[in-house]
Design a protein with these regions (language model features):
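N-terminal organellar transit peptides
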Residues: 1-130, 137-226
Length: 226
């Protein structure tokens, strides 16, 4: 193929641009004005797409950064205020997380409970500890085949003077009880079994999670997600 037949290559020669460099960086048949545009950053491109589709990726340890999910839920409910609940576009939360900050977890769970816009939680790899509680809190709960769930009572570390440690322990014991009561109310888990099993790490595969009411469906076709 004679590359010099292409106008862009002739322009490149006139400007002293190496032809091979030109071919490494542009597509043939694309106008010069378009070719000179910088391609969008893949991360930002996907971020914009997810924002438009109301998709949130709960990846990695749960921390204050994930309060963005609470903000997203609030924003979507504001946008949907004049739309009937059944006509609202749902929010989809894809989960792969080892768990994390219990206070952030509780904020997310309560945002889900307050949301009139439907929130679908989807386990696509692991939902451990706090992430398992968030998974179970969705208005609709899904999981891909081969995924994993782990529940336990959580762990805390306290520091400071004895009075401060006692105050912290009392507060977080109360918070853990609230979370436990909530999880038992949205799943089929037996309270006695939960109390016994959750002392240590209690693991579920996708079928166990379905049977226990942690999820509503195991997804076998991606058409069910989109």
């Amino acid at each position: 193929m004679d590359k010099d037949k292409y106008p862009m290559i002739k322009i490149a020669k006139q400007k002293g641009i190496n032809k091979m460099d030109m071919f490494d960086n542009v597509l043939l048949g694309v106008s010069e004005s378009v070719a000179n545009l910088q391609l969008p950053d893949p991360y930002l491109r996907n971020l914009y797409r997810d924002e438009e589709d109301r998709v949130y990726w709960l990846d990695g340890p749960i921390s204050e950064e994930n309060l963005d999910l609470v903000k997203m839920i609030m924003r979507c409910n504001r946008e949907d205020k004049r739309i009937r609940e059944e006509d609202r576009k749902p929010i989809k939360v894809f989960i792969d997380s080892p768990g994390g900050d219990v206070t952030v977890e509780w904020s997310i769970i309560n945002a889900i409970k307050c949301s009139k816009t439907k929130i679908i939680t989807i386990n696509y790899c692991t939902a451990f500890s706090a992430a398992a509680d968030i998974l179970a809190s969705g208005h609709e709960r899904l999981a891909l085949p081969g995924t994993h769930v782990m529940m336990h009572n959580g762990s805390c570390s306290y520091g400071g003077q004895s009075d401060a440690v006692e105050s912290q322990k009392k507060y977080f014991d109360g918070l853990n009880k609230k979370i436990t009561d909530h999880i038992l109310s949205v799943t089929k888990l037996n309270p006695r079994v939960y109390k016994k099993k959750a002392i240590t790490d209690w693991f579920f595969d996708e079928n166990d999670a379905l049977e226990s009411g942690i999820i509503d469906q195991v997804v076998t076709d991606f058409d069910d997600l989109y």
